[in-house]
Amino acid sequence: MAAQVATTKVPEVRDITRIERIGAHSHIRGLGLDDALEPRQVSQGMVGQLASRRAAGLILEMIKDGQIAGRAVLIAGQPGTGKTAIAMGIAQSLGPDTPFTALAGSEIFSLEMSKTEALSQAFRKAIGVRIKEETEIIEGEVVEIQIDRPATGTGAKVGKLTLKTTEMETIYDLGTKMIESLSKERVQAGDVITIDKATGKISKLGRSFTRARDYDAMGAQTQFVQCPEGELQKRKEVVHTVSLHEIDVINSRTQGFLALFSGDTGEIKSEVREQINAKVSEWREEGKAEIIPGVLFIDEVHMLDIECFSFLNRALESDLSPVLIMATNRGITRIRGTNYQSPHGIPIDMLDRLLIIATTPYTEKETRQILKIRCEEEDVELSEEAHTVLTRIGQETSLRYAIQLISTAGLVCRKRRGTEVQVEDIKRVYSLFLDEARSSQYMKEYQDSFLFNETQTSQMDTS
């Protein structure tokens, strides 16, 4: 009788790779300044705009100090001169602790809530509260876990947990909930854990170095830590950083914390905000909390109307106000909601409160360097001739159009099994995709063939 050999099918293990989308400003890492706030020509993804970046560096230092709130900055310049890039550079330089909220001018117009409510929520999102509290924790290395289960299978489980430090060892009695928490965290002998006495939360810090030579199958993510020193019970200061908007939402209704995840916050009453402001001020006086004025960035600010600007004038005078950064590419244009014209479409009384940073068009050398950085970001290799042609296109049309041709030319290159984008690839995508000037010329030539053409000089005789 032939022996049957059992074959075990080994499941295929796939690595989960992190997907990072490449955005228009994903190459920006900071403002590219040295310690003396002097801008480098090319640094952290920023190119040129030396005076604008130096001014933004001063604003950045003012934000980091956190002492001055309610200041407003306007970044004004032609399209494609790096206004949003400077704002993103400020955001990257601030770090994770300082709140940064970005929105476009048209985002505040909604049927669900009023314009002033949308602006109020944006302001509150950009103000952080650092709350300090002291908690008692038990920190030690697990020596042994004993769990006694009832013989009948029903009833409460009880057990004992032995913890030790370098100086002492103690046995704790365990209840049902603590046993479930230990099982959930998969705590075993040799683990270094912390237990929050107030909440009963168990956190596993890692494995003890004394167990490093054990013959256990451990994954690459296993961390080895020293056995804790001193007493088992310690007092630890925990710092929580939340925004004022999150506190507003949680206190606005029952089960308000669920609205933080769903995004359905709705309009929040002013009485709730006043109570929260009073409570936060009380915490500040007691030393329990610290206010972190963040940054609110409003792009395309000319889209706001006269009512929004009136609200901003009042909101900037509050002591709980972030640093407001705005950007616009408009010249002298009509203020939305009125028949009056003003520089950048912003009322004069609002302009009087602003520090204005001007951006200038990029030179050919700077355009070439920006395109080189974008090619590295999008993982596209260009030949020297193709780089020169693309730079000329960027100078004659716009920088955004030239950047958009990089990925399309890279795709054309891959389709022909090439490794480096050549001039022919640039020419092909240039002929396929029109820029603004060629599109306008095309419309002028064939305007009579399009429906609802409003530029026709002759009217049809309907008599």
Curated annotation (Swiss-Prot):
Alphabetized, the UniProt keywords read: ATP-binding, Cytoplasm, DNA damage, DNA recombination, DNA repair, Helicase, Hydrolase, Nucleotide-binding, Nucleus, Transcription, Transcription regulation
**Knockout-associated phenotype:** Fishes display embryonic cardiac hyperplasia with increased cell number and size by 72 hours post-fertilization. Gut and gut-derived organs are incapable of growth and differentiation after this time. The mutation enhances ATPase activity, rendering it DNA-independent and causes aggregation of the protein into large complexes.
A GO MF annotation of the entry reads: ATP binding
What is this enzyme's class at the first EC digit? hydrolase
Q: Where are the transmembrane segments?
A: none
Q: Name one GO cellular component term.
A: nucleus
List the Gene3D superfamilies hit by this protein, alphabetically. 1.10.8.60, P-loop containing nucleotide triphosphate hydrolases (3.40.50.300), RuvB-like helicase, domain II (2.40.50.360)
Record's SUPFAM superfamilies?
A: P-loop containing nucleoside triphosphate hydrolases
Catalytic activity as recorded in UniProt: ATP + H2O = ADP + phosphate + H(+)
- A Pfam family name for this chain? TIP49_C
Q: What is its EC number?
A: 3.6.4.12
Check the record and name the SMART domains matching this protein. Answer: AAA (SM00382)
Q: Where does ATP bind?
A: 77-84
User: What family name appears in the similarity comment?
Assistant: Belongs to the RuvB family.
Query: Its function?
Result: Has double-stranded DNA-stimulated ATPase activity. Has ATP-dependent DNA helicase (5' to 3') activity suggesting a role in nuclear processes such as recombination and transcription. Represses gene activation mediated by beta-catenin. Proposed core component of the chromatin remodeling Ino80 complex which exhibits DNA- and nucleosome-activated ATPase activity and catalyzes ATP-dependent nucleosome sliding. Involved in the endoplasmic reticulum (ER)-associated degradation (ERAD) pathway where it negatively regulates expression of ER stress response genes.
Q: What does the annotation say about its assembly with partners?
A: Forms homohexameric rings. Can form a dodecamer with ruvbl1 made of two stacked hexameric rings. Component of the chromatin-remodeling Ino80 complex. Component of some MLL1/MLL complex.
Q: What is this protein called?
A: RuvB-like 2
Q: What taxonomic lineage is listed for the species of origin?
A: Eukaryota, Metazoa, Chordata, Craniata, Vertebrata
